[in-house]
Amino acid sequence: MVRGRFAPSPSGRMHLGNLFCALLSYLSVKSRGGEWILRIEDLDTARCRPDYARQVEEDLRWLGLAWDEGGSAGGPDAPYFQSQRTALYEAALARLRGMGLVYPCFCTRAQLHAASAPHREDGLTVYPGTCRGLTPEDIARREAAGRKGALRLRVPEETVTFTDGHLGEVTEYLPTDCGDFLLRRSDGLFAYQLAVVVDDAAMGVTEVVRGADLLSSTPRQLLLYEPL
């Protein structure tokens, strides 16, 4: 069965881009007799607010977009709020660490902005792997000095190809197009890429509709599906 999802972040009122994605996802799923899930991506509790999450549901109802499970209604894969699913992300991160695919990154935001890594055509900066080669002693010294590291995925030298419903076949070379991306921030907040993959897999999502600005997330998420 086709299972799609709409997964907004309740950090403000929905805009036309959000609503357009919701409508396309809903119509795509329902035209094939599938199920539509509403998931609230509220991991960043400093920016996300419960009243915005409630407004999402009100807006969808006003538009006549009825979800089959999720949101405040719950369902078999509850909870549908990412802030309540952190134990699942911890388990996934532990699995990746056990496979040697994770390393700490102590780069500051200023260092990342100043990095001489190549920039994608869409303006995104690819992490240059500054901390990838740190030894256990290097890491211990930084941690002893009170520095908290973020956690990154060690990206292999591989190519990922996927089919986009609008653009057709898209191919990206992971080291230069994605780089070693974040799994958990230095403040302990789980990164979008990890949480989305864990949730989509757990909820049996078979189709994702996203804006062009999030297209670069697709190869990262496909890569994470393999070990998880």
Describe the role of every protein-language-model region.
Residues 1-120, 212-228:
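N-terminal Rossmann-like or analogous alpha/beta NTP/dinucleotide-binding catalytic cores
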